[in-house]
Amino acid sequence: MVKTKGNQKIVGMHPRNVLRTQPDYTKMAIKYKDFRQQCQLELNGKVSVNFRNEKTLRELTKMLLKEYYDLDVDFAPGSLVPTLALRLNYILWLEDLMEPLNLQNIRGIDIGCGSSCIYSLLGAKKNGWHMLALESKPQNIEYAKENVKRNHMESLIEVYAQPDNTNIFKSYFEQDQQQLQYQFCLCNPPFFDSNLPNPLGGNTRNPERRPAPNNARTGSQEELTCVGGEVQFVQRIIDESLENKERVRIFTTMLGVKANVPRILDYLKELQVANVSTTEFHQGHTTRWAVAWSFHSEPLQQGTT
């Protein structure tokens, strides 16, 4: 159980992140009934939030999306519940990468949008981006489409059901008659290696363990694991990026293990991809890493959030 204090600055978070100042959960509990039911009232009149409870995390994320972005989002049972601060840090970094391009219309690809479709919804709502949300799990597709419809985002977001989850872009691009150009892709890859005896035990093929999460772990096995873990998944994106240099301007991905960053950078170097940028996403006690690469001549913006 975590006692909450509003108006505290969270060190290291992106300066434009609305959650950099911790929300006043006591006020939020008064305003949002479903969230209030997951809170515990302390003797001093303040509320405590148990971040290790999955149901609490669901109501917390739903409440924050409604409060800050007027988004009504639901999650499929047993699916990944995204933490908003981290997703915002990723979106804000993409904004920073897009800024030098000075483009009026921006199109992005959300690889594995999940049931919430949160990245696409945030990108569309916050920036008016046109998003292609890719997803292979039927239940997630159903919920993602409903989330888009509920928030009247059909004109900005297309949820595409990938028939084959062994490829990233191929299925959609082969049937895309318009041959649209995309300015970026984003990805929150499955962290864990399904080849391991205990894939959700925290280990990847890298000997360094991923730090245990402070929040309750949510998500289906399909969302959290894949063959080879996040390194092999991202390498597949890199391989396909070589075939789609003209379709996507900037390729990006998040990583959950710091030691995997140099492994991805080495793989890009082996393939002679020189235009590369890295960053870190800080949100409270949790840090994630991200890598961007491009085949265009304009250097990618460097720096961390």
Curated annotation (Swiss-Prot):
Keywords: Methyltransferase, S-adenosyl-L-methionine, Transferase. It is an enzyme of class 2 (transferase). S-adenosyl-L-methionine binds at residues 87, 112, 135, 166, 188. One of its GO terms (biological process) is rRNA base methylation. One of its GO terms (molecular function) is mRNA m(6)A methyltransferase activity. InterPro entries: DNA_methylase_N6_adenine_CS, METTL16/PsiM, METTL16/RlmF, SAM-dependent_MTases_sf. Pfam families: Methyltransf_10 (PF05971). Residues 197-221 are annotated as: Disordered. It catalyses: adenosine in U6 snRNA + S-adenosyl-L-methionine = N(6)-methyladenosine in U6 snRNA + S-adenosyl-L-homocysteine + H(+). Belongs to the methyltransferase superfamily. METTL16/RlmF family. This is U6 small nuclear RNA (adenine-(43)-N(6))-methyltransferase. It comes from Drosophila melanogaster. The lineage of its organism: Eukaryota, Metazoa, Ecdysozoa, Arthropoda, Hexapoda.
